[in-house]
């Protein structure tokens, strides 16, 4: 099984996979819980998540904006939102003395953020961290501009949303820091990225966002696990994943951690380009750092992972 751009869906799929003993290759899921307290033996995740995003972007924000800042959060009301906000706020508080002055929580699918933005505008915050996902992220960012919150406050996207810059425009993404799984200009650095981006561009007529990279790599890694297992029997495939073989990806060498089935992989930091600096209509971001994954990760049992049985 595969699918999910919502971590709530990913967690539900984890439970279904374990119950039915069917392998689940996670789609997009940024919650700490997916390979934390809600991990299962039958689930594997390729992409980065709240804790690694926070530990990657945190030092960048402290260097760019300094210590002892006041921060506001916009948080979607489900597992992804709460865990990304928790990891980000805790890192910035512990390492930089940043203070969360307001955390505006909104339901999934909200279209009107006026109440949240009024509270944020009156909070005294200097930095706005928008954790909203998908269309919610687009609408809340656009409305933050309309309310004058942006550019009064620095905007940060602690967990980058595919197609966000395309939808809000370079005028809003300019200067914004974000952590991400992948950006297509990495084709200039990694051979596998170059192969994938060129093939994707030829077939679809535009450059891939990280959701496409995530899907491709997830199934390439599944195929590798099946090949080394010598068949499709799920317990054998799982044990093949758990061997921790070093694999090549679009961001360098990676491997799965056997204790929680989380891929140990770099996190990419990007910053939005000025419109005049863009070399094409999709050239929204500059890759500023590629940060090794292992030092960003919590200990395997820190978030309560207990994988369960093979059969």
Locate predicted features:
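Extracytoplasmic ligand/sensor domains, especially the bilobed periplasmic-binding protein
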Residues: 1-103, 152-178
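Surface-exposed patches in mature extracellular/periplasmic domains of secreted proteins
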Residues: 3-4, 70-76, 207-214, 233-237, ...
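Hydrophobic alpha-helical
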Residues: 7-18, 112, 118, 125-147, ...
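Sec-exported extracytoplasmic/periplasmic mature domains
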Residues: 14-22, 62-67, 89-97, 118-125, ...
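Extracellular/periplasmic periplasmic-binding protein-like sensory domains
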Residues: 40, 141-216, 227-233, 237-238, ...
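Catalytic-loop motifs flanking and including active-site residues across diverse enzymes
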Residues: 53, 57, 84, 136, ...
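Structural motif
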Residues: 53-57, 105-120
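Solvent-exposed, acidic/polar segments of extracytosolic/periplasmic ligand-binding ectodomains
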Residues: 174, 243-311
């Amino acid at each position: 099984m595969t699918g999910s751009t919502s971590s709530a869906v990913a967690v539900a799929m984890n439970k279904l996979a374990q119950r039915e003993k069917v392998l689940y290759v996670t789609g997009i899921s940024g919650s700490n819980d997916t390979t934390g307290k809600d991990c299962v033996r039958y689930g594997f995740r390729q992409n980065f998540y709240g804790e690694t995003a926070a530990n990657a972007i945190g030092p960048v924000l402290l260097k760019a904006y300094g210590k002892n800042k006041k921060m506001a959060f916009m948080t979607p009301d489900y597992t992804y939102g709460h865990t990304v906000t928790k990891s980000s706020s805790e890192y910035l508080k512990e390492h930089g003395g940043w203070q969360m002055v307001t955390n505006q929580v909104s339901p999934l699918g909200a279209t009107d953020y006026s109440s949240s933005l009024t509270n944020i505008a009156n909070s005294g915050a200097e930095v706005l961290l928008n954790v909203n996902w998908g269309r919610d992220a687009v609408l809340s960012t656009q409305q933050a501009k309309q309310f004058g919150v942006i550019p009064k406050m620095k905007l940060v996207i602690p967990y980058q949303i595919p197609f966000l810059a395309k939808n809000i425009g370079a005028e809003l993404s300019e200067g914004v820091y974000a952590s991400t799984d992948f950006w297509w200009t990495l084709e200039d650095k990694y051979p596998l990225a170059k192969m994938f981006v060129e093939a994707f561009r030829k077939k679809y007529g535009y450059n891939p966002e990280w959701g496409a990279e995530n899907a491709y790599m997830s199934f390439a890694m599944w195929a590798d696990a099946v090949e080394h297992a010598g068949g499709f029997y799920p317990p054998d495939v799982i044990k093949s994943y758990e061997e921790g073989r070093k694999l090549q990806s679009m961001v360098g060498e990676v491997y799965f951690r056997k204790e929680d089935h989380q891929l140990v992989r770099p996190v990419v930091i990007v910053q939005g380009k000025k419109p005049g600096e863009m070399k094409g209509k999709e050239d929204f971001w500059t890759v500023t750092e590629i940060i090794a994954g292992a030092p960003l990760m919590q200990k395997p049992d820190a978030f309560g992972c207990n994988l369960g049985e093979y059969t």
